[in-house]
A protein has these predicted regions:
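Membrane-embedded alpha-helical bundles of multi-pass transporters/translocases
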Residues: 1-520
């Protein structure tokens, strides 16, 4: 694999690491401020919809549809044609999103009723959750305009990525985290309902992200004046690819929205427990899988345009191997150390030992699907780079159906934990079907060394998990320690686990050069 691709991956991972660390700090601040009660449930609900749209546009459908077309124009056209494409895309997309944003703000009550049906039912009948419905409707009015800002932020980031400027778009989410932290520290004390300050932070964070990237577009002479271009050939191609991709890429996020709706029928705290467990999974998912996906999509699109199927398959194989290298130990490590991680990160203020235990249960269920969700981020570009958006949609529909069935099977005996387990099961099915499709089409064939490589990773990960499980005390002991001592103990154990993993890999014969090629 080329040094340029590896270097790009390292840059994106580094910038993403900064963003994810700030995201964890933000969640620590939120846990301290709101805990896992009524206010937390309502804020996480109100933030779920714009957050879903962020995934959809910043890491999903728009990027998957736009980058291959942009790459094609860059290769086959001159700069004027590229700028004309960008103007048409910006104007058309901007017009549509402006209308959607206005409808979302004006219809926040309808959206709240749709995705928070349990709260809406109580509101209609004067039940105990009526206050949640009213507060969620108000907060959604504040957070929904984030969609408008993040749409153009995503477009700017996709343009920069096609020019090899990966660091800017990867670092941009840091500003959302900073503004939300600032809102919690400085605006919340001034308000009767501190959760509203966080909604204001989401709005301001979208604005700051929107403004940050545009000077970099000017540097590459790609800052254009938007104009309506519904019938522009490039726009036609992008929307043809994007409409099915809106569904195909966002299956896991749609499943989370469904889980949120069902959790509104459960006891207070269910939405918060699911949120905190999901946030911990987002760290390895964003740091590793999204970073790898970000750099391989333009590379795959170029290899498809160049008609180089062998190198296309090798690039995909490299992406899968990197996800396995980082995803297997992350999955096992989080599963084993979930309680101490939650304790150290969130147990302060309104978030106590009970909340740690409850969040830990859903985190364990969610972790079973972490590797599959990471693989989806690498396998899906194998379709979108070839401008095939229909196959992921068909697979996504099957995955969503599986999620619904699992929800019905698991929610009664397991409650909110069953919802987390359903998402994990549907994600695993999604990844398996994506791989099967690529293999049957002879688009991606793993190298003969990849199977052995992955088996060695599994052995090293299991041994690492065994060491951590043996050395880690129970939750009561973690809770009895001071924050300082618990943090030191956790850092030492995680460092030891990483060392065990690395040493076992070396003993099994894996060397750094194997990360650049198909060797084992």
């Amino acid at each position: 694999m080329s040094k340029k691709l590896i270097k790009s991956g390292m840059i994106v991972s580094g910038m993403t690491l900064a963003s994810r660390v700030m995201g964890l700090v933000r969640d620590v601040v939120i846990a301290n401020l709101l805990g896992a009660g009524v206010a937390a449930d309502v804020f996480f609900f109100a933030n779920r919809i714009p957050n879903f749209l962020r995934r959809l546009f910043a890491e999903g459908a728009f990027n998957q549809a736009f980058v291959p077309v942009m790459t094609e124009y860059k290769k086959n056209g001159d700069e004027g044609e590229v700028r004309e494409l960008l103007a048409a895309v910006a104007g058309t997309l901007g017009g549509i999103v402006t209308v959607v944003t206005l409808l979302g703000v004006l219809g926040s009550g309808v959206l709240t009723a749709l995705f928070g049906w349990g709260w809406f039912w109580d509101w209609l009948h004067g039940g105990p959750a009526a206050e949640k419905f009213e507060l969620a409707s108000l907060m959604l009015k504040i957070t929904f305009p984030y969609l408008w800002f993040i749409t153009f932020t995503a477009m700017a980031g996709a343009i920069l990525n096609t020019f090899g400027r990966f660091a800017v778009s990867s670092f941009t989410p840091v500003f959302l985290n900073i503004t939300m932290i600032a809102a919690a520290w400085w605006i919340a004390p001034l308000m009767d309902k501190p959760e509203i300050s966080l909604a204001i932070g989401v709005f301001l964070g979208g604005l700051v992200q929107f403004l940050f990237q545009y000077p970099f577009l000017r540097q590459i002479n790609m800052l254009v004046w938007p104009k309506w271009g519904w019938h522009h050939p490039g726009v036609v191609k992008i929307r043809t690819l994007m409409i099915p991709a809106l569904f195909g890429v966002s299956v896991s996020q749609i499943n989370l929205l469904v889980n949120t709706m069902l959790a509104s029928f459960l006891a207070t705290g269910a939405i918060s427990y699911l949120y905190y467990s999901d946030r911990l999974l987002e760290f390895p998912l964003g740091l590793f899988a999204v970073a790898i996906s970000t750099v391989i999509l333009p590379a795959l699109a170029k290899k498809h345009v160049d008609a180089d199927p062998a190198d296309f398959s090798r690039t995909m194989d490299w992406g899968v191997r990197m996800v396995m290298l980082l995803g297997l130990p992350a999955m096992i490590g989080i599963a084993v150390m979930r309680e101490p991680i939650l304790r150290v990160l969130f147990m302060r203020g309104e978030f106590g030992l009970h909340e740690v235990a409850m969040s830990s249960a859903s985190l364990l269920a969610s972790t079973t699907g972490l590797l599959s969700l990471m693989l989806i981020k690498v396998l899906a570009p194998g379709y979108y780079a070839r401008q095939d958006t229909k196959t992921p949609v068909r697979i996504g529909m099957m995955s969503m159906a599986a999620n619904m069935v699992c929800n019905l099977l698991f929610i009664y005996p397991l409650g909110y934990v069953g919802l987390a387990l359903s998402t994990a099961c549907s994600g695993t099915l999604n990844a398996a079907l994506l791989f099967k499709g690529l293999y049957q089409q002879s688009v991606y064939r793993p190298s003969r060394h990849t199977g052995v490589f992955c088996l060695k990773l599994l052995v090293a990960s299991v041994l690492m998990g065994g060491v951590l499980a043996y050395l880690s005390p129970d939750l009561a002991q973690w809770g009895a320690w001071s924050m300082g001592k618990a943090s030191v103990q956790l850092t030492m154990l995680l460092s030891l686990g990483a060392a065990v993993y690395a040493v076992v890999l070396l003993l099994l014969g894996i060397r750094p050069r194997h990360l650049k090629s198909g060797q084992q």
